[in-house]
């Protein structure tokens, strides 16, 4: 198992053990999605249909069961960069939701479904990041630097749009 697969497996365990926080009773997927690293330009086109500050994205439509793909920008290092790892976790939560057909109520609008999915992913992402900040502080006696985004939507930093510039080759 390579380092990225090992990280993904550990994030699966973390997600599984924290689902109660968001009142979810998901079955753990018995496989991992393919994680494909693509250029920022390509990911922007896929995720936003125009240039946008996206780092990671799990498309919830047109996935083939057992062959799901999660996208991250080339150069992003979820193994060594906590900020990128939290984005990966957020996108993996969407994979779990997709795997479990979460929020598939025919009476709900796409906006309602999107909001519920994002809310659940945000809560788990923030909890994970907070735990990691605490672990880092206990281990080093220092605050984690640089601080990660406070809010990520569509795999991008909402509160600090310039944050992504360090990951995008211009």
Predicted regions and their residues:
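A metal-dependent hydrolase signature that marks the N-terminal structural subdomain at the beginning
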Residues: 1-59, 156-158, 162-163, 170
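Sec-exported extracytoplasmic/periplasmic mature domains
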Residues: 20, 93-101, 126-133
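Surface-exposed patches in mature extracellular/periplasmic domains of secreted proteins
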Residues: 22-33, 102-114, 133-144
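Secretory pathway export signals and precursors
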Residues: 44, 48, 79, 144-145, ...
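Active-site scaffold of zinc-dependent metalloenzymes
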Residues: 46-82, 92-99
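Post-HEXXH active-site segment of zinc metalloproteases
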Residues: 81-82, 86, 98-127
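Long, well-structured alpha-helical subdomains associated
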Residues: 126-170
């Amino acid at each position: 198992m390579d380092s990225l697969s090992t990280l993904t497996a550990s994030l699966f365990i973390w997600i599984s053990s924290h689902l109660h926080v968001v009142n979810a009773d998901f079955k753990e997927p018995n496989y991992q999605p393919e994680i494909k690293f693509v250029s920022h330009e390509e990911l922007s086109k896929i995720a936003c249909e125009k240039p946008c500050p996206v780092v990671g994205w799990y498309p919830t439509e047109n996935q083939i069961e057992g062959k799901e793909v999660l996208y991250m920008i080339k150069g992003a290092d979820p193994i060594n960069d906590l900020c990128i790892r939290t984005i990966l976790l957020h996108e993996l939560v969407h994979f779990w939701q997709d795997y479990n057909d979460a929020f598939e109520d025919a009476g709900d609008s796409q906006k309602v479904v999107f909001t519920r999915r994002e809310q659940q992913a945000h809560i788990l992402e923030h909890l994970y990041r907070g735990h990691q900040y605490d672990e880092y502080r206990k281990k080093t006696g220092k605050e984690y630097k640089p601080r990660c985004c406070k809010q990520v939507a569509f795999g991008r930093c909402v509160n600090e749009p310039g944050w992504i510039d360090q990951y995008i080759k211009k």
